[in-house]
Amino acid sequence: MFNSDNLRLDGKCAIITGAGAGIGKEIAITFATAGASVVVSDINADAANHVVDEIQQLGGQAFACRCDITSEQELSALADFAISKLGKVDILVNNAGGGGPKPFDMPMADFRRAYELNVFSFFHLSQLVAPEMEKNGGGVILTITSMAAENKNINMTSYASSKAAASHLVRNMAFDLGEKNIRVNGIAPGAILTDALKSVITPEIEQKMLQHTPIRRLGQPQDIANAALFLCSPAASWVSGQILTVSGGGVQELN
């Protein structure tokens, strides 16, 4: 029988990385509104603090923590901070990442950085919080991957392959952690109208995107936050090892 309480996160404690803006910010606010206590992590400390202020104004509990996800030391400090402030970690949302288009003849440092942002940080932070989740009977790890993981395009070698690696981590970590009652899933967003996308999209590009989108609009950060809430809630207690594409049914390309 359906129970709306299964979409609540009351009593849960969550870390959300890259939560100072865009999708991560919306996930943090949505989770807090659903009852979770959240650590808002971002490389931009001011942005993280602003999100915490918004959550507190809504009556939620949140703490800000600056973190450069390419630093193992800072990831470890983030996990320690969350445990010290929240007492436990039930949910990790690995939203921070990056990379973007790079030419094939890119320096190897650029190629490595895509993997540091999208793969190594996700895996290491998961390693850090999984034992804490196990102590408390289980938990949920969610990563924001990309439709680029399954698609092909010019100048996307480093970004797309790193996101494909992250997606495959989801599938394999679900097996590694399932016996500990830790679920692992991912979301592959389509074109989401974050401030970052709004700064580069033109009306012509948007119209081209809409031609390939059965639901004739581009996504909003709340669309991804809603999917994240489901996947991290008790309503998805038998969902693990999955990548959920949220794209209005289409494939949008920024070219």
Swiss-Prot record:
It is an enzyme of class 1 (oxidoreductase). InterPro entries: NAD(P)-bd_dom_sf, Sc_DH/Rdtase_CS, SDR, SDR_fam. Inhibited by N-bromosuccinimide, diethyl pyrocarbonate, and some metal ions such as Co(2+), Fe(2+) and Cu(2+). Changing residue 146 to A/H: Reduction of the catalytic efficiency by over 65%. No effect on the affinity for cholate and NAD. GO terms for biological process: bile acid catabolic process; lipid catabolic process. Keywords: Bile acid catabolism, Lipid degradation, Lipid metabolism, NAD, Oxidoreductase, Steroid metabolism. Homotetramer. This is 7alpha-hydroxysteroid dehydrogenase. It comes from Escherichia coli (strain K12).
